Amino acid sequence: MFKKVLAGFVAAAMVATMAGCGSSNSSTKDSGSDKAAAEATTEAAAPAKVLNTNAANKLIYCITPSTSNPYFGTVQTACKEEGEKLGYKVKCVSHDDDATKQSELFDTAISEGASAIVCDNAGADASIEAVQKAYDAGIPTFMVDREINKEGLCVSQIVANNDQGAQAAAEALVEATGGKGDYAELLGLESDTNCQVRSNAFHRVLDQTDMKMVAQQSANWD
């Protein structure tokens, strides 16, 4: 359900962008019951030049990590379904968490005159250059699930509240164990901002208990 809501946020944001609407500095949270709710943050003062030079082409590129992970497959499917409902052709491709491949996919989207790019990126810092190229070409980028570490390049960065979600999970673990015992922590992709945020929030709760971490290993989201 979260993926559908996220895709809906993206679709609504793209409609506003294609219509030439300006952006604001406000944040919008999904009204659903999930504690890890979707949060849409509109970048400060997105310039008119990314609002959008290729709108008439009605082509959206959706760029995500490998769809071997069902989550990213669902993101692509939802984006495609929502985009097509609005009359856009949606091309879904994967960067496989390779920043170089991601950059090449951005180049292709730019050369084909994409109206917009939706991206679940290959690294908060490593993705800045690719997004900058789209920005310079007048193509708006909507970042989903994972942010990049530079403001003003994306029209929106639509992400889950990973801090809140991880804290809730840690609190549930403490309740189930009475705050005692050993545990192992499986991390996501360690270069990913979401991984760091979740781990920090998890430890903010567990480090106040008598629980002991005996192992920590990256699962790279697989």
Residue ranges and their predicted role:
Residues 2-4, 8, 14, 18-222:
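A residue-level marker of the well-folded mature domains of exported/periplasmic proteins
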